[in-house]
Amino acid sequence: MESYYLDWANLLLRWVHVITAIAWIGSSFYFVFLDSSLVPPESKELRDRGVGGELWAIHGGGFYNPQKYTVAPKVLPDHLHWFYLESYSTWLSGMALFTVSYLWSASTYLIDKSLMHWSSGAAIGVALSFLVVFWMVYDLICQAFGQRKNGDAIVGALVFVVVCFASWLACQWFAGRAAFLLVGAMIATAMSANVFFWIIPGQRTTVKDLREGRPVDPIHGQRAKQRSVHNTYFTLPVLFAMLSNHYSFTYTNKYNWIVLVLMMLAGALIRQFFVMRHGYKLGRNSHPWPYALVGGAVIVGAIVWMKPPLQAAVVSPSAASTSVATAAGAGPGFMEVKKVLEQRCYMCHGSAVQMKNVRLDTPELLKQHAQSVYQQTVVSKLMPMNNATGITDAERALIGQWFRAGAKME
């Protein structure tokens, strides 16, 4: 019954997380586009009011004319819309989902005992420390180098090195699936922390100074803009880290941390293409296509590099006369497979517990799920999760032979 409610919690939290993330990413991408597309106003009246750029656009049958002030307007309106709830809601729902999906069952989903044999409490503590330590290191880098000459390039290079190291470390300490998600959560935490600790406080200071008649220090807007730009480059790498959980060939690869780094780098390069594309149309920067091409080349390179070796075609018992199994005329029997399932699978898919509502402890139910068992246990090797029950390659091969011979139940 507990697994039933956990599945519902997982589904609903995932739904909320996707909804809030769409809202946050959508508004973030829009304002990056807006900043890249602004042109100096032609109207002297607008320039006299302090407007530094404007955009004319049409959408949904209406015309829009957003304007951006160089620093701030002389008088603020009574109602001022703020963009921060999207960020906070995304992080809170994501943290809740991470807790339900991984921390709640750390021994199953977070820990791979072949990598680190530690307690659930220790694994949870270290996982949470990844979120905090990365934010602290990233923030120190930004404060130390962000305002220097070529500060953006220096910060970008240093943060990339830190992300590479964190990816390697996470894949050495945690189960691959959890490691990928943890790196994504680590970066996403820094994104939301940028909003909470820098962007919104700086904007509140600016608004307070305006309302109280004090001169506005432009540094607050500059810092907020810098962190906002960082967030836009973090977005696609985080999305890959989250989506990769559904594709075990990424995080089960021997060099999984390199796979993660390459795909996140490709995401950042592709995001750079979109950022520069708007300015290119206005003649402000060079052609953005090289970034997209390099990003695409990184992805293609990863696909070719990760390509599994060709396997010999499976020969049916009736077609091959040289193998012992063929001579016998049949693959492994049900009782042989049942012994493996009893030791490796029934604790999560038996009469007492049915994770994901999958039960395998009767011939009828096993026959029903035979394709899934073969796919998850033999092809992707995703199950047992993190190999918590210690299934051997020989046992996986036995299940594969049984399935390819027709998954017989006698």
Regions found by a protein language model. Give the residues of each.
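Cytosolic-side membrane-entry/anchor segment at the start of a transmembrane helix
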Residues: E2, S120-L169, S286-P288
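Cytosolic juxtamembrane amphipathic/interface segments immediately preceding
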Residues: Y5-L6, N65-F83, D217-G221
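Alpha-helical transmembrane segments
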Residues: L13-I25, S119-F130, G176-F196, V259
